[in-house]
């Protein structure tokens, strides 16, 4: 007769009791001919609008739209990747327009979303944290 090791039994029970956290899923769509990517949580939401083909003219028309439950009118949002990379985005009325954001910061934000993993959007009074799968085909620059 084979007796299960107590250490193995405890390890198996511990592994079964550890909850598996599902990744936050981007909702992908198209609005006015532009690709959109949205994430929502109980604490707020974020929507990225891309214009890789310059549909509405030669200037960039991308935007990051944010809504925080505890900070209704932030003037700055920082996108923080788990790696420590950060992008600072000036916000007006919940919108960070690509044309108004430093190109390097916009690129860092897009790279963070493209890479997936854990990241946060932070204001002076609130934050949203997500963990997503990579978006390797994200074209938003």
List each language-model region with its residue ranges.
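N-terminal signal peptide c-region/cleavage motif recognized by signal peptidases
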Residues: 9, 17-19
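Short beta-strand/loop motifs in extracellular/secreted proteins, especially
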Residues: 73-78, 117
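An ectodomain-focused feature that recognizes extracytoplasmic/extracellular
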Residues: 22-72
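Internal interaction segment
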Residues: 81-141
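Bacterial N-terminal signal peptides that target proteins for export
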Residues: 1-8
């Amino acid at each position: 007769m084979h007796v299960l090791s107590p250490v193995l039994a405890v390890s198996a029970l511990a592994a079964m009791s550890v909850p598996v956290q599902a990744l936050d899923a981007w909702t992908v769509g198209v609005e006015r001919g532009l690709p959109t990517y949205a994430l929502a949580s109980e604490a707020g939401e974020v929507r990225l609008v891309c214009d890789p083909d310059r549909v509405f003219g030669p200037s960039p028309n991308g935007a990051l739209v944010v809504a925080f439950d505890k900070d209704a009118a932030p003037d700055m949002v920082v996108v923080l990747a788990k790696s420590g990379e950060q992008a600072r985005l000036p916000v007006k009325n919940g919108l960070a327009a690509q044309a108004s954001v430093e190109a390097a910061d916009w690129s860092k934000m897009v790279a963070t979303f493209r890479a997936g993993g854990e990241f946060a959007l932070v204001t002076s009074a609130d934050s949203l944290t997500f963990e997503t799968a990579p978006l390797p085909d994200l074209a938003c620059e």
